[in-house]
Amino acid sequence: RQMCIRDRPGARVLDLYAGSGQLGIEALSRGAARCVFLDENREAVNIVMKNCKNCGVFDRSRVNIGEAARFLSACREQFDLVLLDPPFRGGTLEKILPAVEKCVAPGGIVLCESETGIVLPAQTGSLTLQKQYKYGKVLLWKYTKPMQSAAEQEGEAL
């Protein structure tokens, strides 16, 4: 996680299922331009706001309460780094990953965290699985979006 976050200075970050905001705050502390945090739990949202203030990154943060699927369907922004750390069990990650694609900027990265035993696709839309890491009972999935769409690449080849 830290390597991917560190390599994105100036990034626009989306931290879905923010929890305490740890991942997004880490990105901001390593040079991300701004971070949008989302969690559906009011207590978690209050904790994220408090943590952003305590860490001195509140001015580069936008903290929202709401359901991830609804947020993504209405989202008109694109992000360079999307962090997905939903609650384990329940199939949340498998359901939400396809909806994330439209919010990922060309050349963007999606980092997903899950429990072991989960199987995610090697490709979902324009997102391609680059690496999978295992840390004890946790899996980290790194997806990337190409700088150009396949249609744009074909057009240049002609």
Question: For each of these PLM feature ranges, what is it?
Answer:
Residues 2, 6-158:
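Class I S-adenosyl-L-methionine-dependent methyltransferase catalytic core
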